C-alpha cells in the first residue's frame, strides 16, 4: 500500500500533537493541521450550578488558539472543523444514557471508536492527505506474516493510551501515524523546546473534555434540563450481599462500581458499591474483598492482532486506564441475545470490574483486541 506525502495532523493545542507536527515537518512531510471542534464550552455554563469554562482546559477556545499558533509557527495550513452535532449524538448522549442505566462510560473511547478517527480520515482525504497523525502514546506496525496492522503499547508505559484505542479498525491503523510511540513524555517536552514551541511546558489535561471539574452528575442534570428532559426516577434500595436493606438512594446514576464515598449509609467497616441493577434499581454494597471479580464478559469486541477469537486463549487483560494488565483466560461465548461475546476469567480476582468500561486484551506489548464490560 502506497501513500502520498501529505499527512493531516490532529492538533489539540497540547504539547503532544504540536510536537508531532514539528517532528513530521522536520522529516519532510507536507502537513495540514486539523482541529475537531467537539463541544461549546460555554453551552451549559451557569445552568444548574455548572461552572464557567476554565481558561486553558482541554478543548477550550484557548486550545484552538494554541493549535493555530503552532501551525503558523511551523508554516502549515490549519483548519478548524465543526463536529459538535455528531459529538453530541455519538458521545454525549450515550455518555448520559450509560450513567442513567447504571453503567460507567468512557467518553474518550466512545469518541475514538465512533467519531474522531473516522472524521479525521474523512477530512484528511478532503484536503488531499492519505494519512493522519495524532499525539497518542501508542505504536503501530504492519505484520506481513499475519497480514494485519498491529497496535502496540508505547515506550512510556505511564502514558500508554492503547486502552482507549482498542476500537481502531485495520483501515484506520493503516492510515494513522503515532510518532510519539517511541518516546517518553519528558523527551517529548525536550523535542518541543528544541523546536521552540511556546507550549513546551503546557500542563497535560486530566479531565473529560466536555465536563468541567469532572462533575458528571452536575453535567447530566444541566444537560437534561437544557434538553427539556428530567432524570428518570431510579431511586431504590441499598442492600448487602445477603439482601439486607441498609437504606435507600436517590438514583442509580449516582453510583459506580468501586465507589466508597456518598453511599448514604454507615457501617462499622468501609462499604463499596459492588453491583448496580438497572432493572430493580438496587445497589449492592459490601466489603473491599467482596469487590474482587474472577469472571466477567465483554461485548462488541474488536479484534486487532487476530481476525477473530475462535477459541480459548491466554491474555493480559486491562480493565481501566490505570490498571496493570492481569493474566486471564479469554474464550468466545454467546450473549443472551445470541451475539458474540468474550468471557474473561482472571488467574487472580481483580478489583472493581465495572460495567461500561472496556476490557482490553494484550499479548505482552501487542493489543489483541478489546470490548465493553457487561
UniProtKB/Swiss-Prot annotation:
Alphabetical UniProt keywords: ATP-binding, Cytoplasm, Disulfide bond, Nucleotide-binding, RNA-binding, Transferase, tRNA processing, tRNA-binding
Top-level division of the source organism's lineage: Bacteria
Signal peptide: none
Top class in the EC scheme: transferase
Compartments where found: Cytoplasm
HAMAP family assigned: tRNA_thiouridyl_MnmA
NCBIfam families: PRK00143.1 (NF001138), trmU (TIGR00420)
Name assigned to this protein: tRNA-specific 2-thiouridylase MnmA
Gene expressing this chain: mnmA
Amino acid at each position: 500500500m502506497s501513500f502520498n506525502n501529505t499527512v493531516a495532523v490532529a492538533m489539540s493545542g497540547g504539547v503532544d500533537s504540536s510536537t508531532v507536527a514539528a517532528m513530521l515537518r522536520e522529516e519532510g512531510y507536507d502537513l495540514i493541521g486539523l482541529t475537531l471542534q467537539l463541544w461549546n464550552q460555554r453551552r451549559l455554563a451557569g445552568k444548574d450550578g455548572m461552572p464557567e469554562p476554565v481558561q486553558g482546559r482541554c478543548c477550550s477556545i484557548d486550545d484552538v488558539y494554541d493549535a493555530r499558533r503552532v501551525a503558523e509557527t511551523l508554516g502549515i495550513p490549519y483548519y478548524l472543523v465543526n463536529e459538535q452535532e455528531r459529538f453530541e449524538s455519538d458521545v454525549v448522549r450515550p455518555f448520559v444514557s450509560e450513567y442513567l442505566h447504571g453503567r460507567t462510560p468512557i467518553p474518550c473511547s466512545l469518541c475514538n471508536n465512533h467519531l474522531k478517527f473516522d472524521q479525521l480520515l474523512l477530512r484528511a482525504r478532503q484536503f488531499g492527505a492519505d494519512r493522519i497523525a495524532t499525539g497518542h502514546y501508542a505504536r503501530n506496525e504492519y505484520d506481513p506474516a499475519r497480514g494485519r496492522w498491529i497496535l502496540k503499547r508505547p515506550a512510556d508505559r505511564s502514558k500508554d493510551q492503547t486502552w482507549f484505542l482498542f476500537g481502531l479498525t485495520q483501515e484506520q491503523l493503516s492510515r494513522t501515524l503515532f510518532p510519539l510511540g517511541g518516546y517518553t513524555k519528558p523527551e517529548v517536552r525536550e523535542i518541543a523546546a528544541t523546536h521552540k514551541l511556546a507550549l513546551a511546558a503546557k500542563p497535560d489535561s486530566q479531565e473529560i473534555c466536555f465536563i468541567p471539574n469532572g462533575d458528571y452528575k452536575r453535567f447530566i442534570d444541566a444537560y437534561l434540563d437544557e434538553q427539556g428532559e428530567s432524570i428518570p426516577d431510579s431511586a431504590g434500595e441499598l442492600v448487602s450481599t445477603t439482601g439486607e436493606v441498609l437504606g435507600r438512594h436517590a438514583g442509580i446514576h449516582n453510583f459506580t462500581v468501586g465507589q466508597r464515598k456518598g453511599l448514604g449509609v454507615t457501617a462499622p467497616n468501609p462499604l463499596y458499591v459492588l453491583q448496580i441493577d438497572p432493572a430493580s434499581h438496587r445497589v449492592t454494597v459490601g466489603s473491599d474483598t467482596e469487590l474482587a471479580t474472577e469472571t466477567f464478559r465483554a461485548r462488541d469486541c474488536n479484534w486487532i492482532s487476530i481476525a477473530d477469537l475462535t477459541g480459548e486463549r491466554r491474555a493480559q487483560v486491562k480493565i481501566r486506564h490505570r490498571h496493570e494488565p492481569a493474566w486471564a483466560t479469554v474464550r468466545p461465548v454467546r450473549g443472551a441475545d445470541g451475539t458474540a461475546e468474550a468471557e474473561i476469567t482472571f488467574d487472580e480476582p481483580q478489583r472493581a470490574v465495572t460495567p461500561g468500561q472496556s476490557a482490553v486484551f494484550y499479548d505482552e506489548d501487542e493489543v489483541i483486541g478489546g470490548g465493553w464490560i457487561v
